[in-house]
Amino acid sequence: MNECVLCEGLKNNREIFNRPLYETDNFVIFPDRLPMADFHILIVSKKHYINIWDILNVGLELELEKIIQHVNNRLISHGYKNIVLFEHGKAHKSETNGGKSVEHFHVHIVAEVPLLMQTLKKSHSEIIVYNSFDEMKKAQGVLIDYLYVRDLSSSVMSVFTMENGIASQYIRLLLYSQMSKTLAEKLQITGEYGFDWKTHDKVITPNIVDFYKKIII
């Protein structure tokens, strides 16, 4: 059985994994390999978990929330707005992958994405709303694949469920479709599949790492 690409990367310290931006006992932050926003990072669990409910069930939600708020506060202090967190969630009993490219718990934080929440709410009527991680934990997960999305200016957590499954990198595609030409040129991403990190060989340079570290640390 092949090892999870994130577990392998964390263990062997390869590629972007030798350039963490910030870490705690159980989580580590990396820059996204192909950013879809002016600021785009991943929070990844060091151990192999599948989804947010795994994190809640092992009691790591307070540590995760502390990291989320740290990043959010740092972004606000640097003048960023419209900060959103999202996860492509795979239900354990699902035969599909929930739109995840890698089946290892990770959430994205993106900034300056004013249309994302609005677009999701217009496009998807199946929305479950939680006001805290405690509420989510009591719900004990969902049986189908989902999108977990939070506007970090609020405590509200939205879970969008999709009976027909979720396309791979679905939110990345939404962000790419909403991206201005100026930002696309700045991020150097073009083409019909410009959102697909698997088709790009973009290298995370030390300059990029330094840019993110100055914001986060």
Task: Provide a role label for each language-model segment.
Residues M1-I217:
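HIT superfamily nucleotide-processing domains
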